[in-house]
Swiss-Prot record:
It comes from Takifugu rubripes. GO terms for biological process: endoplasmic reticulum tubular network maintenance; positive regulation of endoplasmic reticulum tubular network organization. Residues 105-126 form a coiled coil. The keyword DNA-binding does not apply. Disulfide bonds: none annotated. A zinc finger (C4-type) spans 277-302. Phosphorylated. Phosphorylation occurs during interphase. Phosphorylation also occurs during mitosis; these phosphorylations reduce both its homodimerization and the ER three-way tubular junction formation. Signal peptide: none annotated. Residues 339-348 have a biased composition (Basic and acidic residues). This is Endoplasmic reticulum junction formation protein lunapark-A. The chain crosses the membrane at residues 44-64, 68-88.
Amino acid sequence: MSVFCLQAKPTTVEILEGIDKDIQILEDYSVKYQRQMKAVVGRLLLYSILLYLMAGVVVYSWYLPEQLMGRLVLGLPFLLFPLLVWILRKVLILFFARRTEKNNFKLEDLKAQKRKILEDVMETETYKNAKLILERFDPESKKKTDFDSTPVGPQMTPKPGQELRHRNVVPQTPPASVNSASGAAARPPLASGPAYPGRSSHSAPGGPPERNLLAIAAQQSLMRKFVTPGTPIPGVGLHPPGPPLARPVLPRERGVLDRLIEYLVGDGPQNRLALVCQQCLSHNGMALKEEFEYVAFRCAYCYFLNPARKTRPQAPRLPETAGEPKLPCDLNSSSCAAEEDKQSDSGD
């Protein structure tokens, strides 16, 4: 009979449930202690101020003695009363702080005990039971393990300023060329080659490569059709082949130190002007206000040469002084002979 009277050993779930209840109770006690401390200290200060003012008014109105010594003796409690209130406030704060500290110690012990039980569960229980227990009593670690086990694919993040440089250039071509581009898109193996036999797909160094852009656009449209969403497409959003930007594009997100340096030096986006191509209206960087009128650049997207708005003025040539050494000249030259004649005439 004694064997049947023995209580059954509590399971892991029951132990964890009891620990969770105790943790919740202790957390509620911590919040309760904080509220009680604020309420008690606030009431103490409020009642003390009201009592101090009422006592001062009553004593000043009816019980104020005429002698100086009596006034000093009567004013002594008014000087000691604020000190007494301050000491009482400190005692109350210390009392509630000790209770909160003991409560926190118990709370930390229960959390450590729960953590140890969960570690034992992962080692002793089966996968199914351990998963259910973790989902119920430790959802944060479960989410963390699921996040770590989930493979994260590479993401293509644009560099600072790259979103300003990415423009879609659509050249204006007749309908026949559009049809040929669509036909080239229908035949993927021929899209990378030249569009017409006997002609090169590269144009002159100064002109825009229309056929090359058409082939790239057709290839990108074909890749968008057969690629699933979320898969990075190579070559999309990158800088096109060609000359670099005339001036760099300043990033939007700048720190406090960068803004301070820009303010001291006089640099920054507010002190620069954008270099916009006259043909395709693409952004080619930002130049300083002093050099904006004199910058000539080739567009990095359509390769159009944008001339400078003004010609930089050149300083006048300095006049030659008498003390400068003269270059040696040939005696047989006519110029040297003329100079010698002038010198002889002046000597006469």
